[in-house]
Amino acid sequence: TSRGLGDVYKRQTKEDLFITCIQRGMRILTQVIEEIMASDDKLLVKAEKLIRATCVHSKRNANYIRLYNEIASEKDSERTQMLVREIESETSGIYTTAIAQALAKGDVRPDLDPRLFAFFLDNLLMSLQFSYTCDYYKERFKFYTGVDVEEMDEERVIGQLLKFVESAFTFEKK
């Protein structure tokens, strides 16, 4: 027999349903991240693929991202702490490992801290994600660029963010 949404609500609280939805959305994104970061590509090629995947995922799974933003914005919530541990522990490890490997190969500037750079990279990608899905971030994007994110040429967004990331990973102060 098929179950309706009402049956789901009887078995779970609304909070449980939200968390289940967020976990599903994050599993989708994490699979893509793992696939990209496991490749033998150089870090900047991986970064471009991550940026592209973020754009696609943001449009395809906007509801998951909006829900994540809403729940992650709560103050002093056990649920927020649980989500951070569950979601961020995976991506932080994947990014940190990839950056540390690039550092060991000499593909990035030698003075970077892989953990901090992983955090900063994730912040850029998260901000991009929210710019496609959350009203505040959409308005923020429009304020800075003068263009609605939906009207902006996606290749321009990808290219400019990649230049920014590339300079962060390769530019050394002389």
Positions of PLM-derived features:
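Single conserved hydrophobic/aromatic residue that forms the stacking wall/gate
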Residues: 1-9
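An amphipathic alpha-helix adjacent to DNA-recognition modules
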Residues: 10-34, 48, 52, 88, ...
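Short coil/turn helix-boundary motifs
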Residues: 14, 39-43, 61, 75, ...
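Hydrophobic alpha-helical connector segments
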Residues: 20, 24, 34-63, 114-121, ...
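Secondary-structure edge/capping motif, primarily at the C-terminal ends of alpha-helices
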Residues: 36, 40, 65, 69-75, ...
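Short secondary-structure transition hinges
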Residues: 55-96, 100, 116-118, 146-150
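C-terminal peripheral helix-coil segments that are non-catalytic and often amphipathic
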Residues: 56, 89-93, 97-105, 123-174
